[in-house]
Amino acid sequence: LAPGTRTLYLRTVRCLLLEKFGDRPVDVAAMTPDDVRYFFASQSELYSTPGGVGSVVSALRGYFRFRTACGDQVHALLGVVSYPANWQLASLPKALDSAEVKRLVDSLGWEGPSARRTDAMVRCALDLGVRCGESATLSLDDIDWRAGTIILRKTKSRREDILPLPQTTGRAIADYLKLERPQTTSRAVFVRCTAPCDQPIGPDCVRKAVRQAYARAGLPYTRAHLLRHTMASRLLAGGSSLKEVADVLRHRSLNTTLIYAKLDSRNLAAVALPWPGCVA
């Protein structure tokens, strides 16, 4: 499991045990199916998507499987919660339209203590589809300025990917490194702007910076991942194939990229059947 997933699962299990036992010693044999159901119901209200609720199920089932392997009699708890229906490709991926992209880009270059760092992180997401965790772990050694490439090492798929570095993205990163980045021995590209400056930023810092960029542009969005969808949509609109989009997004399977076919208006129009107006 990825570090972020492990942290999420640990937090869920910790909440379950605290709700049931408080400060008392944990006796998993004393936990009943109703305890798990009530906890699951309360946790489900915190998530707005089936995927979020599914993460609670995965955390609980993983913990009960672990306790079973340890010899605890918790077989009755394994089947208490089930995954919600989550139909793949059921919805359109949300993305910024061209006017919203222009508003976001025009809002960059603002004056502030971390302005250039924010600009560089937004450009990484918008131009390369870099995830928040990947931005946070980006190293100075990952950028080949002469070749115009960038290496993403700590990716979701746990492999190294080499991507071309667009001029606008490279310029934004270079401006941050030359004009704003604190003097530090850290090899991380993006570091804290306040003490301790030797520490790299975390994914939450990237998410917060993108949310603030949305707000400055007057856009009603909060999710940083929206910029990754936007990049895929722009590639399709520019004539790129799904295979090319999959390569840039670094998807292992082309099936993962198929959802973006719904945004390919150019090719969809070519295969659309005439509307039977006489029937309507």
How should each PLM-predicted stretch be described?
Residues 1-280:
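Conserved catalytic core of the tyrosine transesterase superfamily
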